[in-house]
Amino acid sequence: RPATVCGLSERLRLDLTVNKLTYDAFYKKKIFVDGGSQIRPNIHIKDLISAIDYLVFHKKKFNHNIYNVGFENLMISEIANKIQNKIDAKIVVNKNRDIRSYRQDSSRLLKSGFKPKYSVDFAIDELINFFKTKSKFNFTNKNFNLLRMKELNIR
């Protein structure tokens, strides 16, 4: 079970916590936080790909068990502060509309020998560097899964 994915990818998702907050900070100079005390587990896209590769390559070792793949359980406010430390942006706290909060324990996967290499801080840095190379990142509904599903009339 993967955590909330973050980081730069060929199809950049801007509806995921770290990516969205970094995008808003960079382009809008505001980080919009609903509540902030909710916890989200995170995984960099490169680590997710490595974990899938690792699980497939060592499939006999895992015997069809379920493994969590997420390594940084952070409050939304912690993520916002990490971003604010890198971008001059104001944190705007709104009433908490999304009260979901969850953690992941990936110790079983770590005990098997898998080691993540990328952090939320790394994801923030690479997103900032990517946005710096673009005068205005031209996002479309393809960058937001729910909007894309509506566009394709998928329920």
Predicted region positions:
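Flexible, glycine-rich beta-alpha linker
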Residues: R1-L16
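Anionic-ligand binding region
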Residues: L21
